[in-house]
């Protein structure tokens, strides 16, 4: 494990057996220099307490990447990202409160929005970006939904799946990639 200064480029770098943590990306969201280069919503994740979850997430993504192809749709991406988040939360025993605030109480509305707009199986990059890329907020729930809401919904679907597959080990979960089947087995539609 190495610490490094990356000139604000990469947060975590993984190469073979080396892990590099760019300390300059975790100086706290109020770090004055960040204001010159980043938007407030980007600075929110640049806190020291994000180092360990980010290390786990980057490691898992490097080991269990998504085989992205032309047929990959929003639910596949949500569940893949959600699976990584679910595992990290499970291993570290935490929940990102900032991400969850408002989501749990509005979960049904969020799901209805996705379904009503026929986005679940969307392959359009703009639709996918809406749910999966960092932004100040998502224009849903009166603009109060956090960015990356697709990842949060994906983690909720994975949690539903795991409730029905209590004997499934984390390693086995990470190796699963048939997201359409997992989605159907999750029972998540039955909020």
Q: Where are the model-predicted features located?
A:
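Acidic/His-rich structured neighborhood in mature extracellular/periplasmic domains
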Residues: 1-101, 171, 175-176
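A cross-kingdom marker for long, charged
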Residues: 75, 79-191
